[in-house]
Amino acid sequence: MLLADVVATSTAVAATRSRTAKVAAIAGLLRGLDPADAELTAVVAAYLGGSLRQRRTGLGGRSLSGLPAPAGEASLEVAEVDRRFEEVAALSGPGSAGRRAAAVADLFARATGEEQRWLRGVVAGELRQGALDALVQDAAAAVAGVPGPDVRRAAMLAGSTVQAVVAALRGGAAELAGFGLHVGRPLLPMLAASTTSVAEAVAGFAGPVAVDTKLDGIRIQVHRGPEGVRIATRTLEDITARLPEVVEVVRELPARAFVLDGEALVLDGSGRPKAFQDTASRTAQASGDAVVPYFFDVLHLDGADLLDVALRERLAALDGFVPPRWRTPRLVTADPAAAAEFAAQALAGGHEGVVVKDLDSPYAAGRRGGAWVKVKPVHTLDLVVLAVERGSGRRAGWLSNVHLGARDPATGGFVMLGKTFKGMTDETLAWQTARFRELQTGEDGYVVTVRPEQVVEVAFDGLQRSTRYPGGVALRFARVVRYREDKTAAEADTLETVLALAR
């Protein structure tokens, strides 16, 4: 199969908002595969989901700059592209950077313009084509003639959409039924929907709910079985060797085999959580500040799989063998006022907020459903647009990703805090494209620089330390609320205001 076929499908998926049309486009490509060719099926499934099979390639922004002119005709095969990235990922030692750059240049020289744009996006992890794993799973179900939930459950248990797609196309329902929970093999974690109101979250369920403190750490999934302890991140990366203190905690728990879901974070001397970056930095290595685990769910316990058991029963099992000091703080209540007070206490303690959970719900891994609802405070700032990037896929022809800056009275200029393409309707995209063309002062490839005059109200979940931006901080999960035509750049929020939020 040609890479051009994958790129064309990705482009078609990105060009529509219809979920049905997206699934149909992906299914059309999957039908062209030989189900017996598991290797090619796996690569195509990964590419349709917007990722490479290689977790790390060593490629960054510099590696993708100054690339050769595109080829005039499509000739790259999917299997060859995967093989090239496998070779690049294996490079190490003295001179590897040069060999990596040469290999990438050779690959890109054989790619057309559309293929180069797609390759840049997938390497950088910024491929905005709308083909999320859930769509690929549904497309595989349609091609294989099996229920969508069967593919989704197999993906959950395997910890891999790619494996589930290969199984569905090759063996249908029979092969999908062979997937099960195995202690020691990470599975996809359950995700939460979002709201800004604790009362609204509680009112969405009948009867009492579990209200968990939302800790600002890294998600961990802990497996203990005959082969020992294994710790995986939300993305299923094995970090066991980096968290020896967590391994010791798990070894002391009074059970033979189990799978726990939780968070790990670094605390300061007073017991308050340190900044997320401190936890992220510590969990990237095997030494440093102690990492403390907090567990909020159990998926398997001594031979019994608990995925399909109601949360209230899973919590009872969790409380039965995990001491309170290692459990996420929790309140069970049907009273919105009590839940709101618990959330206020969590925020006062330096935590992110709370997660409200349906006590009757099973563990629906890998899906952001309504059984769990996270509630976090939302901050807004009035910032100035410094530049904007040309859109791709469905946003081709528009100016999309805006670069955001805070006012710096000390210099009279602006300090960049991040960028976002979130929160934009088609009307917003059309308006901002016209507006920023009016303000344009230059253009370098995909980035259009503009006069710093347009104020935009931006919502975000918090701030994080950053060495990328001169202010030392960056916005977390920023999205556009509205453009403030009633404000001038001189009225935008200052860097001092932003830094005060970080303290």
UniProtKB/Swiss-Prot annotation:
Task: Cite a single Pfam family from the UniProt record.
Answer: DNA_ligase_A_N
Per the record, the similarity remark reads:
Belongs to the ATP-dependent DNA ligase family.
Q: What is its EC number?
A: 6.5.1.1
Question: What is the protein name for this chain?
Answer: Probable DNA ligase
Q: Which organism is it from?
A: Kineococcus radiotolerans (strain ATCC BAA-149 / DSM 14245 / SRS30216)
Listed under catalytic activity are: ATP + (deoxyribonucleotide)n-3'-hydroxyl + 5'-phospho-(deoxyribonucleotide)m = (deoxyribonucleotide)n+m + AMP + diphosphate
Q: Which cofactor does it need?
A: Mg(2+)
Q: Supply the source organism's classification.
A: Bacteria, Bacillati, Actinomycetota, Actinomycetes, Kineosporiales
Q: Top EC class per UniProt?
A: ligase
Q: Which UniProt keywords apply?
A: ATP-binding, Cell cycle, Cell division, DNA damage, DNA recombination, DNA repair, DNA replication, Ligase, Magnesium, Metal-binding, Nucleotide-binding
Function noted in UniProt: DNA ligase that seals nicks in double-stranded DNA during DNA replication, DNA recombination and DNA repair.
Residues of the signal peptide? none
Indicate yes or no for the key word DNA repair. yes
Q: Does the entry feature the keyword Transcription regulation, yes or no?
A: no
Q: Where is the active site?
A: K214 (n6-amp-lysine intermediate)
Query: Which GO biological process annotations does it have?
Result: cell division; DNA recombination; DNA repair; DNA replication
Tell me the GO molecular function terms: ATP binding; DNA binding; DNA ligase (ATP) activity; metal ion binding
UniProt binding sites for ATP: D212, R219, R234, E263, F296, R368, K374
